[in-house]
């Protein structure tokens, strides 16, 4: 090969290599752009409960301005269903679900479900169990029975019943794990689950394991982050150790439809919801 031919060959090779590199980079960029993102980011309003108590209309405006499209209620602060529905509409928000205490449902489930339906909720979520109702295996059997009784009532009202976990459901009682028992013994046609990703992780569970063992049972999730060991304190979403990309990548298997940011004790609630919304709206998985 002559010197000139060699130079021409190497120049051509260089151009080709640049083309390959450029194509690879472009393909990588396209692949990244095509990765999934959350269509809507929601907020559990317990995060801003003090703000809601002081100024409910103003708080909903700030929530919408922070980028949230959906909210989950934890109390209505004296407003009627019609007033709540109007405030949601005014701020361009929807509210797929609400946390309603088991005591309220036991006292008057007909009214609770009717009010939820009037607001436009699709799910009524049992948010918590007092300690005296979860001490023994028999207590948990009674809770499962109650959920299976409330489920048909919710369905008759045009709603779905769901249960929200903390960490105590993952602590063995009488040789069983209550969370596993609930998932196994409640009727999937009538009872859904809202997985709190922080509390499952805090309790030693693995969200992906539950998605694999109980597919399509988790239409709702609470997205809250953990600083990790040793104290596992709650932090703003995206500032901690929970691998949301890995979790969200299994959303189809889990059946997740709605993602609600939550922080139980934020130092600055407004800053927390803004930081968390920014992270989730830019997250690709």
Q: Can you annotate each of these PLM segments?
A:
Residues 24-53, 62:
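C-terminal segment of N-terminal export signals and the immediately downstream linker at the start
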Residues 39-44, 71-73, 95-100, 124-126, ...:
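Hydrophobic faces of well-ordered beta-strands that scaffold small-molecule active sites
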Residues 60-61, 170-176, 199-257, 265-271:
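Gly/Pro-rich active-site loop or hairpin
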Residues 43, 63, 71, 88, ...:
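Conserved, mostly hydrophobic/aromatic
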Residues 49-53, 72-82, 101-108, 131-135, ...:
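Acidic-and-aromatic substrate-binding clefts and catalytic sites of carbohydrate-active enzymes
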Residues 14, 70, 94, 102-193, ...:
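Active-site acidic/histidine proton-transfer and metal-coordination neighborhood
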Residues 1-17:
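N-terminal secretory signal peptides and thylakoid transit peptides that target proteins
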């Amino acid at each position: 090969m002559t010197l000139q031919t060699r130079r021409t060959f190497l120049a051509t090779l260089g151009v080709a290599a640049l083309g390959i590199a450029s194509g690879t980079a472009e393909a990588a960029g396209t692949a990244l752009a095509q990765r999934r993102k959350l269509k809507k980011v929601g907020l559990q309003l317990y995060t801003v409960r003090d703000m809601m108590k002081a100024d409910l209309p103003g708080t909903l405006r700030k929530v919408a301005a922070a980028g949230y499209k959906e909210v989950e209620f934890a109390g209505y602060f004296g407003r009627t269903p019609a007033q709540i529905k109007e405030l949601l509409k005014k701020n361009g928000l929807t509210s797929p679900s609400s946390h309603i205490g088991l005591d309220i449902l036991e006292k008057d489930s007909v009214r609770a479900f009717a009010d939820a339906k009037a607001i436009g909720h699709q799910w009524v979520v049992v948010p918590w169990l007092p300690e005296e109702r979860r001490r023994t295996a028999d207590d948990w059997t009674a809770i499962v029975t109650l959920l299976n009784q409330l489920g048909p009532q919710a369905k008759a009202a045009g709603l779905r019943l769901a249960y929200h976990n903390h960490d105590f459901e993952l602590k063995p009682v009488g040789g069983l794990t209550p969370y596993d028992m609930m998932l196994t013994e409640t009727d999937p046609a009538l009872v859904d689950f809202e997985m709190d990703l922080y509390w499952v992780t805090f309790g030693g569970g693995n969200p992906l394991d539950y998605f694999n063992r109980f597919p399509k049972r988790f239409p709702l999730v609470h997205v809250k982050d953990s600083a990790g060991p040793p104290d596992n304190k709650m932090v703003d979403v995206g500032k901690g150790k929970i691998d949301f990309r890995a979790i969200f990548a299994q959303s189809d298997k889990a059946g997740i439809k709605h993602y609600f940011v939550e922080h139980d004790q934020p130092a600055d609630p407004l800053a927390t919801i803004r930081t968390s919304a920014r992270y989730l709206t830019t997250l690709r998985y």
